[in-house]
Amino acid sequence: MIKAVIFDMDGTLVDTERLGIKAWKAGAAELGLAIDEALIHQFIGRTLPDVMDILDKHYGSHETTEAIYRRHKEIRDEMVKTELELKAGAAECLDELLAAGYHVGLATSSRLVTAERNLKMVGLFDKFETVTCGEDVVHGKPDPEMYLLACERAGFAPEECAVVEDSRNGCVSGITAGCHVFAVPDLSLI
């Protein structure tokens, strides 16, 4: 029986992935570089160290990776202030689950400071009983560590937890952890 529902954040609850794609492209362009959208899609659901490794391999230079990341972050942080949107039905879903007595948790590859900022902006942060972030794990999604820790923090076995995810990496993470996984893909990214 499912007793807890653990949500991914980016692309599942808030539309940050669309902003991230725009910011990666703009940051690279400002530095005179190109970044392919297929490469950016590899970042979805991954921790920052994993993203940096992907970029290091792609560009062959950690200095280039650092420069693109810094500019992307500046652009994204500005965009979030005015363009961040809640995914349709997210707030209502959380409210219904809480009212029905389910434990509601968050498992995001984002850092806690980012998750807290973004979710407070859309009025969702206080709805989560437990929060697991990218800096809490050594191995990011698709490794199961994120969801295993989220289940542990929730106080339930993985088979008692449902995971709500939008990315392939996140779904693989939840499935490998032994959770029930519900995929809600962001159709604008397909």
Residue locations for each model-derived region?
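Metal-dependent phosphoesterase signature
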Residues: 34, 55-92, 100-102
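Short beta->alpha linker loops
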Residues: 19, 43-47, 85-89, 110, ...
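Active-site neighborhood of HAD-like aspartate-dependent phosphohydrolases
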Residues: 1-41, 176
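Asp-based, Mg2+/Mn2+-dependent phosphohydrolase catalytic module
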Residues: 1-3, 95-98, 111-190
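Short helix-capping segments at alpha-helix termini
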Residues: 30-33, 60-63, 123-127, 155-156
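Conserved SAM-binding loop
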Residues: 13, 86, 104, 139, ...
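Helix-loop "lid/cap" segments that line or gate small-molecule binding pockets
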Residues: 27-28, 47-61, 118, 150-151
